[in-house]
Amino acid sequence: VDVGGESTRPGYTMISDEEEISRVVPVVEKIKAEFDIPISVDTYKSGVAKVAIDAGADLINDIWGFKYDENMAQVVKDGMHNRKEMDYTDYMNDVLNDLKESIAMAKAVGIDDNRICTDPGVGFAKTYEQNLEIINKLEMLNTLGYPVLLGTSKKSVIGLTLDLPSDERVEGTIATSVLAVVKNSLFVRVHNVKENKRAILMTEKILGKY
């Protein structure tokens, strides 16, 4: 379960660490008390990450991959691709190189390989066409040697493709989840868990993955 206290969609308004903590920590504590499942906290702020981990978070989902907050590498356990600019010279190679930099930063502070996964950051500093390309070429991330996570749930790339509002993007999300399985990604981050799980299980059965 991924818990976030601040929206990171395009045009979002930044909130203070204190406000974000007040939103996130009670939810983490409540989930941890009632369910035995891994909890991820979506934050790019090291102060929030530290408090979240103390509250029981198992993973930190940093959309900037350690590059926004210089202290984040000390606490983060999950990296994702994002950058401030959309100026890519060689799109896929730039994405891979950015992720390699984030991985190197994680390893430099002693984060074990088995605590790292890579996320191409669909919807972050990418055009519509680039988002489609990264999903289509998702298997290239496997060359980095780490599990791949795809997070496309209800994102604008689906809305723009199907001309649908966010609450009607379930089927589009499922399509990307199925493709993630085909491309050998180990994780997807979604809102509608039941529907996506069923589609993924069926896809895995067809592919002989279980």
Predicted regions: what they are:
Residues 8-46, 53-54, 58-105, 109, ...:
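Active-site-adjacent loop and "lid" segments of alpha/beta metabolic enzymes
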Residues 112-115:
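Short acidic capping loops at alpha-helix termini that bridge into adjacent secondary structure
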Residues 121-123:
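Short strand-loop junctions, especially beta-strand C-caps/beta-turns
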Residues 1-5:
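N-terminal glycine-rich anion-binding loops that anchor highly charged ligand groups
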